[in-house]
């Protein structure tokens, strides 16, 4: 489930946690698109817990996911495009789109706490920020905006079921 308002996300999370068919789940927040003319590919700035990062196949192979507000984990492809050496402790400055309709952008300098080998065949390269940073800086998206295609600030979940039997029905039940 993705592009959820805070209220819908809270309801869904309670449902997921109570569902006996769910083995585990991951959660995240989509902050916005990474904005830099040196990117020759799509970049998404997000918060993700370990399960969510795993669902994107973007877990750091060196270092870890961000814990502190000024930390970031990202693909080596992004770092290379910015001319930054993939190394724990290096600083990287990133700009992302807070709200595409209002053309609002935010630029911050982060300390690299993790990275992985990027794959240029993948359409979107991920930047993981801490939960604290995401909550502090996310756009307060409304349900109406989500319906109209503004996903910045929307919450999302990935769900692993204990088995794949009747997968569509299980997902339908959680989504109600």
Model-found features: residue ranges?
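Basic-flanked hydrophobic alpha-helices used for secretion and membrane insertion
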Residues: 1-176
């Amino acid at each position: 489930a993705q592009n959820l308002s805070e209220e819908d996300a809270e309801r869904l999370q309670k449902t997921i946690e109570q569902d006996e068919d769910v083995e585990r789940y991951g959660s995240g927040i989509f902050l916005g698109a990474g904005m830099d003319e040196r990117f020759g590919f799509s970049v998404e700035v997000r918060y993700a817990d370990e399960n969510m990062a795993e669902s994107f196949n973007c877990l750091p192979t060196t270092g870890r996911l961000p814990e502190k507000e000024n930390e970031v984990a990202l693909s080596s492809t992004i770092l290379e495009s910015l001319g930054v050496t993939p190394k724990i402790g290096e600083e990287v400055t990133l700009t992302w789109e807070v709200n595409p309709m209002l053309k609002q952008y935010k630029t911050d300098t982060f300390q690299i706490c993790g990275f992985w080998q990027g794959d240029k065949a993948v359409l979107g390269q991920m930047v993981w920020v801490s939960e604290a940073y995401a909550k502090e800086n996310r756009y307060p998206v409304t349900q109406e905006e989500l319906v109209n295609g503004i996903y910045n600030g929307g919450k999302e979940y990935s769900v692993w079921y204990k088995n794949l039997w009747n997968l569509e029905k299980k997902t339908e039940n959680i989504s109600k």
